[in-house]
Regions:
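Bacterial N-terminal signal peptides
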Residues: 8-16
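Non-catalytic, conformational "gating/processing" segments within enzyme and secreted inhibitor domains
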Residues: 144, 151, 205-237, 435, ...
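Proteolytic maturation boundary segments
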Residues: 18-42, 226-267, 409-532, 690, ...
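M16 family metallopeptidases and their MPP-like homologs
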Residues: 45, 50-66, 72-76, 90-137, ...
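Short, conserved secondary-structure transition motifs
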Residues: 154-161, 253-266, 374-384, 593-594, ...
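Positively charged n-region of N-terminal signal peptides that target proteins for export
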Residues: 1-5
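Hydrophobic, small-residue-rich alpha-helical packing segments that form membrane-like cores
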Residues: 144-146, 151, 157-158, 165-174, ...
Length: 938
């Protein structure tokens, strides 16, 4: 697990903090770059710390390569490249990568499209075979049927990410007003659905031929490779692909606003008003981009930020806000976003933003403020390259958009070189007294909250209708097969499976019943540790749910010796992150820090734990913000579905509640409730410590001795709540969200605890049903029907029984059919799977272990499970034995025992006017109508 191929001059990189004269960073990732005759740029990075390889291909084509009337093509091809190519069958791309034990995905933005895989090293040739086939041999499979199927998937993605959520249309409204109609940033990445519907196959194919050639891409192969052998494989699979047109890179196209534009939208999902202000700035390569990056944090990040001081603290207009610089390839914007309280007038917010700007001008900031931001940037930078895929992304991005992988160091140095005058200069140039685009989002019927001078911006709302048949057009073109110099239909054989090397886990027992678990991981100068205190919501008073949650928010607001601002600055100065949060069964502290700052960061954690401030002013603010957050989530269909499903399964058990509580329960809580909880329940004997990173066992054990010594062991009483019995008969439930563009589906029942002997076997059994992209439910509902952006099933468990859940968000007018498809697939899953499917399941599970412990987060997650559930250090091997020993017969026995659709809860959250009636077709009687809190509507 020792990663010695990442060449970093730590001393040079880290000296900048607190120095007046910034040294030039000597940061470097070792790589070899070359180009094929067809123009494909290839970058190889060797890293033998784990037996895995990542492949990332950055195509220089995003929505900015499109034209008005022909938008959404780049995003469409992101989807279509996963479907089929000339030598790889329908839906086989995902299956073949998963069968090799790998993971994969892709993404599109305004400037580019990236595809990636991470696989055990023996499957590299398979990845290159697949990637080359869709780069050079895709067009013969781009049919009208495939095109229309992915149109449906894209529309469902838009419904899920934009149409069916609060404030979803914000970006669309902003860019339509920021950029002229001919500007490549005038449309969203997902595009106009009308453009895709009106596009012909000729249009789509022409776009592909123009932009997806090898000469418009950078491919990075990083990991446990032999460079010479890899070069030969690259030449074999990619060398004969014909280049596309030599299109020039886009030039910067900054915009200027001749006036401030203010627009508004009535949002049926919003419960609180939101204001955004966007100022036009510069492209990502511009010299001013680095200073704008830090300006965004200075204005809005933290309690010292002027936007926070004026809007949150002084005027109490909003519980939260943020500001940031968003530079892209050809233009950029500087954004301020404020989500107010339900009655906040957005005109007051706009005025407060300008008042905060004036405060920034008069109060200014110091070099120390900049140094704290640079420390945070440094830690974030290290985290971004903590995996071979992370390094692959960075190398590909900087090569494609900045001309060289070495630009990663240049851009890093730009941030380190920013000084006070740079930040003041960009503020004066781009923000002060400049025109901007402002969006107002207000709850439906609350036009009194919009800022003066705002005009309605029309949004095309999809009409909700009852079930309709999908109309499939005809018009497939006959395209000749594309020749190759060898038989590409033959999948290469993977080499020997790499041996699983489990990390060496250690444990030390202190006095008082507290233990520390750890593992060394010295690939980067980082340390990650956590403290878990058993209890969480389980120890809340049932009438005051939310106490534990408020504790973890309030304890981060200063200590007895530090004000909230002083604590925040102390953490930032170290470049560390300290997060405290509550779950249903525990309170947790999560810490990430540079190795050299581990001890002072741990000292701050001790101070937070044992010297709380109990600031009454901060308590009132957090309580108010929590209530507002609960109200906001009550309008989000996905949140409603999860919360109601939980209540239906857990009944009167305390686990039926959300850890944040309800509006009523939080309103009843006072600060003494928090103090009493901590004094009674924060106990050493209920706590465990987990630590991974560049630290030895002895250093870790010694470092925590002081913390353990200060911690008292107590007797803590847990209420013995009776776990409800699972359903014996299926029931259908419906929550009405009028005009919802999608229906949220949750189907399932109360199942097993994490410690049940069958739990892990069930997760394996579930794989083919819906445990990954190639699962049956996703293949039918997404790939075959085009009803959803994704469908899944899974078992969730802890020390208490969890749920088996089947879930999806489907197009509203497919609700009835989708729920019945779920039911049918689960019913027929009891027919034995064949040996091929079982082998696929085993491969997905076993082979993926090669990439399981690459990062600090993954490793500490494993250690946390060991500590929480008292698992053997090598429990992974026990799990592997379960997989290897599974037969078709034993798999089927698990299905019959644990997948029982006639005993499940069927919940839909959607538009009752058009979809409620269809739920009767399930055969479980009339659906029971519930409100958003899970109460029966009478």
């Amino acid at each position: 697990m020792l990663k010695k191929n990442l060449i970093i001059s730590i001393s040079a990189l880290l000296m900048f903090i607190g120095c007046n004269e910034e040294p030039k960073t000597q940061f470097k990732i070792d790589y070899k770059k070359y180009q094929l005759d067809n123009g494909l740029t290839v970058i190889l990075h060797e890293d033998k710390s784990d037996p895995i390889v990542s492949v990332a291909i950055q195509y220089h084509v995003g929505s900015n390569r499109e034209t008005p009337g022909r938008t959404g093509f780049a995003h469409l091809f992101e989807h279509m490249l996963f479907q089929e190519s000339q030598h790889v069958g329908q839906d086989q791309f995902f299956k073949k990568i998963q069968n090799a034990g790998g993971t994969l995905n892709g993404g599109t933005n305004k400037d580019g499209t990236v595809y990636y895989e991470v696989v055990p090293k023996n499957a590299l040739e398979t990845v290159l075979w697949l990637e080359s086939d869709r780069m050079g041999w895709l067009l013969s499979t781009v049919t009208q049927t495939a095109f229309e199927n992915q149109q449906e998937v894209v529309q469902n993605e838009k419904r899920q990410r934009v149409d069916n959520r609060p404030y979803g249309h914000t970006n669309y409204m902003m860019i339509q007003n920021m950029y002229p109609k001919e500007h490549p940033y005038n449309w969203t990445t997902i595009g106009e659905l009308e453009d895709l519907q009106n596009a012909t196959l000729e249009d789509v194919r022409a776009f592909y031929e123009e932009w997806y050639g090898p000469n418009n891409a950078t491919m990075v192969i990083a990991g446990d490779i032999n460079k010479q052998e890899t070069k030969q494989l690259v030449e074999k699979y990619f060398g004969e692909i014909k280049p596309g047109p030599n299109n020039p890179d886009p030039k910067p196209m900054p915009v200027e606003l001749t006036e401030t534009k203010k627009v508004y939208h009535e949002d049926i999902f919003a419960r609180s008003p939101r204001l955004t202000m966007d100022f036009p700035t510069v492209d990502q390569s511009h010299f001013d981009a680095a200073a704008l990056e830090l300006l965004g944090q200075l204005l809005g990040d933290g309690k010292k930020a002027p936007l926070y001081k004026v809007i949150v603290e002084e005027k109490k207009l909003a519980p939260s806000l943020y500001s940031y610089s968003g530079t892209q390839e050809i233009a950029g914007t500087f954004n301020v976003t404020v989500t107010g309280f339900p009655t906040t007038n957005l005109g007051d917010v706009e005025n407060a933003v300008h008042e905060a700007f004036k405060l920034f001008e008069t109060d200014g900031f110091t070099n120390d403020d900049l140094d704290r931001l640079k420390s945070k940037y440094e830690t974030s930078f290290y985290n971004s390259i903590s995996s071979v895929l992370g390094k692959g992304f960075q190398l590909a991005r900087y090569n494609e958009y900045y001309g060289s992988p070495d630009a990663i160091a240049v851009e890093l140095q730009k941030v380190l070189d920013v000084n006070v005058s740079d930040v003041k200069r960009v503020y004066e140039k781009y923000i002060k007294d400049q025109n901007y685009v402002m969006t107002n989002f207000v709850p439906k019927g609350n036009l009194n909250l919009i800022a003066a001078g705002s005009v309605l911006f029309p949004i095309k709302e999809e009409k909700i209708i009852k079930n309709v048949d999908k109309i499939t057009s005809e018009g497939d073109m006959n395209v000749a097969q594309i020749p190759s110099s060898f038989d590409r239909s033959v999948q290469p054989k993977d080499g020997p499976q790499p041996r699983l090397n489990l990390p060496k886990v250690w444990k030390h027992n202190y006095d008082k019943g507290i233990a520390i678990y750890g593992a060394k991981h010295d690939e980067l100068p980082l340390v990650s540790f956590g403290i878990e205190i058993e209890g969480g919501m389980l120890l809340d008073d049932p009438n005051k749910i939310g106490v534990a949650n408020l504790i973890t928010d309030l304890m981060m607001e200063g200590t007895a010796n530090k004000t909230p601002i002083e604590l925040e600055e102390a953490i930032d100065a170290l470049g560390s992150s300290i997060n405290m949060y509550t779950t249903a069964q525990s309170i947790n502290i999560e810490v990430n820090t540079l190795k050299r700052n581990f001890e002072p960061t741990l000292a701050l954690v001790e101070e937070i734990l044992f010297e709380p401030r109990w600031d009454a002013k901060e308590f009132d603010r957090i309580k108010r913000e929590t209530i507002e957050s609960i109200k906001r989530r009550s309008a989000v269909p996905s949140s409603i579905a999860s919360n109601v499903f939980n209540k239906l399964n857990y009944g009167n058990h305390i686990l039926s509640n959300s850890t944040t509580g309800t509006v009523a329960s939080v309103e009843s809580i006072n600060i003494d409730d928090l103090k009493n909880y901590v004094s009674s329940n924060f106990s050493a004997n209920l706590s465990t410590i987990s630590i991974v990173g560049d630290i030895s066992r002895s250093d870790a054990v010694n470092s925590f001795k002081n913390l353990v010594g200060r911690w008292e062991a107590k007797e803590v009483s847990f209420t013995d709540y009776t776990m409800p019995k699972p359903n014996s008969n299926a029931k259908a439930y419906f929550v009405d969200v009028p005009n919802a563009k999608q229906s949220e589906i949750r189907i399932g029942y109360l199942s097993l605890s994490r410690t049940h002997p069958d739990f892990y076997a069930n997760t394996v059994m579930n794989m083919k049903l819906g445990g990954n992209f190639s699962g049956n439910v996703n293949m039918v509902l997404r790939e075959e029907k085009g009803f959803t952006y994704g469908a899944r099933t899974g078992f969730r468990g802890s020390k208490f029984p969890g749920t088996f859940t089947a879930s999806s968000a489907v197009r509203s007018n497919t609700t009835e059919e989708s729920v019945n498809i779920f039911k049918e697939i689960m019913t027929t899953y009891s027919r034995p799977i064949d040996q091929t499917d079982l082998e696929f399941t085993k491969n997905v599970t076993l082979k993926s272990n090669a990439r399981r412990f690459e990062t600090l987060g993954a490793l500490r997650g494993m250690i946390t499970d060991i500590a929480r559930y008292e698992l053997p250090f090598d429990y992974i091997k026990d799990n592997e034995d379960i997989v290897r020993n599974m037969t078709v017969e034993s798999h089927n026995e698990l299905v019959k025992k644990y997948i029982r659709p006639d005993e499940m809860i069927y919940l839909v959250v959607g538009d009752a006017a058009t979809q409620l009636e269809g739920m009767k077709s399930l055969g479980f009687g009339d659906p029971i109508l519930l409100d958003a809190n899970g109460n029966i509507v009478k």
